């Protein structure tokens, strides 16, 4: 009888060095690390959601095609329902893109940017080709065009507004890349509600364009994991081949649809976030030695005179959690989500303490 079992020996060799993704959980801190909506969920919309789901039979599987939600999204985006695909968060859709078009191939991506593209690419055995951003974190359009045209590159990715830098890429520049390549061009617009111009008007002209969106940021549904994708039907037909059956549960579908029917309170919250973003940027920039970068998202990237790890640890000790993004192109940088006025005030106060200067 065989008694020795080694799971690691059976796992894919190319994944042995991959570290599981872990999000820190500190329930007793001011949480400014995940770019969440700080104002919580509008009570009146929550009441509408609970009323909607109260009549549902949870013993039945959800609508696999999420038809009613796609109809609601069509009204919001101006895109036909057949050109919309929903997922269990945008993460699932990113992985589906990599599995469908990238396995055994390469993808080009403007860096620094959202780290999950690299992780999902690796899971799908799709090699990453990094295209460093220019000064001010602008996309190097000519370099992206060259990378997208390299042998084996089947996907090109641009996040706008970009996480973690906060800057947006004009649609005109993305159109230059679309014109130059037959590869899939993924435009991640997770933060579109906070700034920048959308590439949705380009969809009808470029069959290789894919746009990703999420309910996690502007619409305060991070806990329910709802993302969606806009693309031509031929692209979606291919993506559906790898989609998990019943990938978006009935509660999440209903909640997202109710959100689309009740946009005014979310727009008010977005307005408050934008106002706080400007105030936070001004106060960060006023701290000696701190460089804050302009943002069109719901977070701000900043560079400190101290090592980022020390600043991160010092803030955490004082009850404030931010994101340490120190790395290539982001030396001594951290990212802070725009919180409520009180959260932002506390963050500035504690950052001043960590840096040894009065805030």
Swiss-Prot record:
Disulfide bonds: none annotated. The modification N6-(pyridoxal phosphate)lysine is found at residue 217. The keyword Transcription does not apply. GO terms for biological process: L-histidine biosynthetic process. Keywords: Amino-acid biosynthesis, Aminotransferase, Histidine biosynthesis, Pyridoxal phosphate, Transferase. It catalyses: L-histidinol phosphate + 2-oxoglutarate = 3-(imidazol-4-yl)-2-oxopropyl phosphate + L-glutamate. The keyword rRNA-binding does not apply. GO terms for molecular function: histidinol-phosphate transaminase activity; pyridoxal phosphate binding. Pathway: Amino-acid biosynthesis; L-histidine biosynthesis; L-histidine from 5-phospho-alpha-D-ribose 1-diphosphate: step 7/9. InterPro entries: Aminotrans_II_pyridoxalP_BS (IPR001917), Aminotransferase_I/II_large (IPR004839), HisP_aminotrans (IPR005861), PyrdxlP-dep_Trfase (IPR015424), PyrdxlP-dep_Trfase_major (IPR015421), PyrdxlP-dep_Trfase_small (IPR015422). Its cofactor is pyridoxal 5'-phosphate. Its EC number is 2.6.1.9. CDD domains: AAT_like. Homodimer. Belongs to the class-II pyridoxal-phosphate-dependent aminotransferase family. Histidinol-phosphate aminotransferase subfamily. This is Histidinol-phosphate aminotransferase. It comes from Pelotomaculum thermopropionicum (strain DSM 13744 / JCM 10971 / SI). The gene is hisC.
């Amino acid at each position: 009888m065989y008694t020795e079992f080694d799971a690691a020996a059976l796992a894919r060799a190319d994944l042995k060095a991959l570290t599981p993704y872990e999000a820190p959980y500190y329930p007793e801190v001011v949480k400014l690390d995940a770019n969440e909506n700080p104002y919580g969920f509008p009570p009146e919309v929550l009441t509408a959601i609970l009323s909607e789901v109260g009549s549902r039979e949870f013993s039945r599987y959800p609508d696999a095609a999420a038809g009613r939600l796609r109809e609601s999204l069509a009204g919001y985006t101006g895109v036909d329902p057949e050109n919309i695909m929903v997922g269990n968060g945008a993460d699932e859709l990113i992985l589906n893109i990599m599995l469908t078009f990238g396995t055994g191939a390469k993808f080009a991506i403007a860096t620094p940017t959202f780290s999950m593209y690299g992780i999902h690419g690796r899971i799908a055995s799709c090699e990453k080709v990094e295209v460093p951003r220019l000064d001010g974190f602008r996309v190097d359009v000519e370099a992206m065009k060259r990378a997208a045209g390299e042998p084996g590159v089947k996907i090109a990715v641009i996040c706008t507004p970009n996480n973690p830098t906060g800057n947006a890429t004009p649609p005109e520049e993305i159109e230059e890349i679309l014109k130059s390549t037959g590869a899939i061009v993924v435009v991640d617009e997770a933060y579109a509600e906070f700034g920048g111009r959308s590439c949705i008007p380009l969809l009808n002209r470029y069959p290789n364009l894919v746009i990703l969106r999420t309910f996690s940021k502007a619409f305060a549904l991070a806990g329910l994991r709802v993302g969606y994708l806009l693309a031509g039907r031929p692209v979606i037909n291919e993506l559906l081949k790898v989609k998990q059956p019943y990938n978006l549960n009935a509660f999440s579908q209903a909640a997202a649809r109710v959100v689309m029917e009740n946009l005014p309170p979310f727009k008010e919250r977005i307005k408050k976030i934008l106002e706080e973003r400007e105030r936070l940027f001004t106060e960060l920039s006023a701290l000696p030695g701190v460089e804050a970068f302009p943002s069109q998202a719901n977070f701000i990237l900043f560079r400190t005179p101290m090592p980022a790890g020390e600043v991160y640890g010092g803030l955490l000790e004082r009850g404030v959690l931010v994101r340490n993004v120190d790395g290539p192109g982001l030396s001594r940088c951290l990212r802070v989500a725009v919180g409520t006025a009180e959260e932002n005030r506390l963050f500035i106060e504690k950052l001043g303490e960590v840096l040894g200067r009065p805030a």
